[in-house]
Amino acid sequence: MKFLKKIFLSIAFIAVASIGATSANACGKVHLGDFDWDSANVHTAIVGYILEKGYGCQVEVTKGRTSPIMAAHYDQQLDIITEVWRDNIVQMHEEAVAAGKIIELGINTPSSTQGFYVDKPTADKYGLKSVDDMKKPEIAKLFADPEAPGKGRMTSCISGWTCYTINLVKHKVYGLDEYYTNFDPGSGGALDAAIAGAFKKGKPVFSYYWTPTGLMGKVDLVQLEEPAYDNECWTKMMAVVEKIKADGPDAYTDTCASAYVNMALTKSASTTFANKKSNKKIVDFIRAYSVPTPDVNRSLAFYMDESGGDMEATAKHFLSNTGMLSLIHI
């Protein structure tokens, strides 16, 4: 079976080596690590489909939260990660690279954002433009936390995601912890549901969120200003974040904080997998795999609105729209 050398994806392209394999035995087993948020799931589904149908691989997927999945990746238990939020785990990721546990395979999604958001109607009505504007009792009451009387609620990351601890530290540095809880919604789906449900009911929203996502194209959220991203400050803050992750919230020490950086999302492979000659074509494919943020957003919107929650159908839809589906089945 032949596979095209280069296929254009909007303004980016995926280079795919020719495939001589027609059976799982020719490729062998590939163990992908996946996370509990939709954009990672889309990439895992697309890559998994190509590996199975195009390269003849036997694909296994293990899905979970950031810390355990990345730990398993560093421990050579998971071969490939297709969406790494590198700056959120920068210390342990760089240590893993330096120790020769993984190799980085370049950029997947060129641009992503994350931060604190308020729904536009509330932001406009009360003049909420920055995190400092949130530090008023009358504003906190708009976002009342039913489980913490006297405080507002900011719906945050899930506790197994590093951004939950980053947000915890930011709350303390910015003084938001006096007015708001850093609420763990329990899952990425519950976070989406909390935001979408509030919009449907016309209720105020104060939440952490990010792009690329399908939901962001459906709701009108305003990102609050924070101190501008500063690499030196971020490094200091992340040292505190890692201490808290290891030893608990009481390990917090005074630090600075800044906005999340506009981040390029990356890919990586375990060195055990990457160093096998038989895996070279797979590693070359993953290295070349890159999807622009708008295409990711469109795929996520399809997943949410048209696929019936079927991630494989979403992958096939994406591949069909880019001309790749027919090539895979040549």
Language-model region placement:
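A conserved helix-loop-strand patch within extracytoplasmic ligand-binding domains
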Residues: 101-156
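A bilobed periplasmic-binding-protein/Venus flytrap-type ligand-binding module shared by bacterial periplasmic
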Residues: 114-124, 262-278, 301-302
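Short, well-ordered beta-strand elements
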Residues: 27-39, 57-62, 151-155, 286
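Pocket-flanking alpha-helical
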Residues: 44, 62-100, 194-198, 214-219
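Ligand-binding pocket segment of bilobal, Venus flytrap-like solute-binding proteins
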Residues: 71-72, 79-82, 155-237
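Conserved small/polar residues in nucleotide/adenosyl-binding loops
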Residues: 329-330
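Short, polar/charged alpha-helical segment
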Residues: 38-57, 169
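Ligand-binding "clamshell"
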Residues: 91-105, 202, 216-254
